[in-house]
Amino acid sequence: MRKYIESKGGTFYFDTEMTDFTTENNVLKAVKLSNGEEIETNICVLAIGHSARDTFEMIFNKGINMEQKPFAIGVRVEHPQEKINKSQYGFSDNRLGAASYKLTYKTDNGRGVYSFCMCPGGFVVNAASEKETCVVNGMSYSKRDSRNANSAIVTTVTPQDYPSKHPLAGVEFQRKLERKAFAEGNGNIPIQRLEDFRNNKKTEALGKITPEIKGKYSFGNLNNVLPEYVCKSISDAMEYFERKIEGFNDNDTIMSAVESRTSSPVRIIRDENYQSNVRGLIPAGEGAGYAGGITSAAIDGIKIFEFIGKIFTNRKIFVRA
């Protein structure tokens, strides 16, 4: 795909950051790059990731209108893949491949709890993007053949949970939890057995489930990382999920923290023509607050492409499958 785009005149800048932009009469004039280059343009699609905190801060300081947005936080849980297979298929057979699942629950106080980014036969990884923070994520290799299945189990948080009304308060909310996770694991991923999590007690030894984690981990107490309402929501949800998947609520289930990058805590405001308050600066995708995963981000990208194509061709264009 890269070579095709380059053959049509496109250019890729690797290891290069957009550090600034200039305007004239509130219209985009140029973007500045970390390599010192300045590119004159009147259209820039701001398709940043949901962890691009430096860019959030830069555009906020430049006067781009932004607002708080709900997202979800929680933990990664690990179970033996064989147990998931037996629950989903009725038996375990390698020819069927590693089974997956999708789970949802609503707490008594109205918060949603759900599985997210489930990784069959996968690994938990440290995905921190800032110093002295810990962020967990999941991944599977193509064979999906590790011993464990893992998934995020997260609960919804809203701007009412954030420390202030500042548009970037959700980012600070994330950052605080990620620093707590780093401290709880002494710089490693903090893990805990589900039984110990419920008893608010630091794990001292593993049970019958061994973690599949890329990188170092340390025993900890995730109650020291997450707000009480999140811990309660997850604990209740794990009991409910046992009705769907036998063994999901096993005392030896491995939990790791903190899963805090489910989606963007910020939305960059755009109008009906996809424009920010600087004309030509077009927020798009998950980091901009208009998607909640790969598929919805791709759909938003298609809408932006069709809009920009109309500008250049003066006619409607459509993406066809």
Model-derived features: positions:
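Residues forming the flavin
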Residues: 1-321
